[in-house]
Regions:
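A short glycine-rich, His/Asp/Glu-containing loop-to-beta-strand
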Residues: 9-55, 60, 111, 118, ...
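Tight coil/turn sites that cap or link beta-strands
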Residues: 42, 47-48, 67, 85, ...
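Glycine- and acidic-residue-biased ligand/ion/polar-headgroup-sensing regions
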Residues: 57-73, 84-87, 174-195, 201
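Short beta-strand His + acidic residue motifs that chelate non-heme Fe in jelly-roll/DSBH
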Residues: 72-75, 90-91, 97-105, 173-175, ...
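Short acidic-glycine-tyrosine-enriched beta hairpin
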Residues: 76-91, 136-137, 195-214
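Hydrophobic, well-structured mid-protein blocks that either form specific transmembrane helices
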Residues: 83-138
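Conserved small/polar residues in nucleotide/adenosyl-binding loops
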Residues: 220-227
Length: 227
């Protein structure tokens, strides 16, 4: 279990960032990764500021806006502004330069940035963004990213992303896509119980050595699952 207040923290004039796993100047030998999940950053960027053009190589990168508008630009001439209800994925492959900045001059942008280590290296860089609103269902977990082409965007790794909003007092069962894998749960808002453990806002938990498990919501919540 990774409690929210145990995460690494980087703070600059323009950025307030929490790191579930080792990143930037935060290093914990026990928190390098969870399977292929290498980075899970909870970022808040000041108006008009952001991550200027920088390179990535051989990494699957997913950005999920939680508030505000996030502007992406890259060396493959992709340019897009995404907001809540949309996500973007990028397979960096042989290499790509990109920027992510706050598109608003007056309001902060908050988003999750997630890095997944790919199973294939030096592939052709690919960018994709899309709406997840049509995929979401009340009190269900919707698969929004997968490796098998069943979702609008695919990753070069045996990884599934699920996201959902669930009312208080509901119970949900979850079956792993692969029996030898694991699931990482990140609670965006609310309070839930998983295997007797209570998770609160921005807590994370890895689940493995099981084929399925159940969660119960104590407060309305939105969570992201990485399987």
């Amino acid at each position: 279990i990774h409690k929210a207040d145990t995460r690494g923290h980087s703070q600059y004039d323009w950025l307030d960032s929490y790191h579930t796993f080792s990143f930037d100047e935060y290093f914990d030998s026990d928190r390098i990764n969870f399977g292929a999940l290498r980075v899970l950053n909870d970022d808040k960027v000041a108006p008009g500021e952001g991550f200027q053009t920088h390179p990535h190589k051989n990494m699957e990168i997913i950005s999920i806006p939680l508030k505000g508008h996030l502007q992406h630009g890259d060396s493959k001439k992709n340019s897009r502004i995404i907001t809540v209800g949309e996500i973007q994925t990028m397979s960096a492959g042989t290499g790509i330069f990109h920027s992510e900045v706050n598109a608003s001059p007056v309001e902060p942008v908050e988003f999750l940035q997630i890095w997944i280590m790919p199973r294939e290296r030096n592939t052709h860089p690919v960018y994709k963004d899309f709406s997840i609103k049509e995929l979401e269902r009340p009190n269900e977990l919707a698969v929004i990213v997968s490796p098998d082409g069943s979702t609008p965007a695919s990753l070069l790794q045996d990884t599934w992303f699920s996201i959902g909003k669930v009312e208080a007092g509901k119970k949900l069962g979850y079956h792993l896509h692969q029996s030898h894998g694991g699931v990482y749960i990140f609670l965006i808002e609310g309070e839930i119980v998983v295997d007797g453990e209570v998770l609160k806002r921005r807590d994370g938990m890895g689940v493995y050595d099981t084929k399925s498990f159940e969660l119960e919501t104590l407060k309305d919540r939105k969570s992201t699952r990485l399987n």
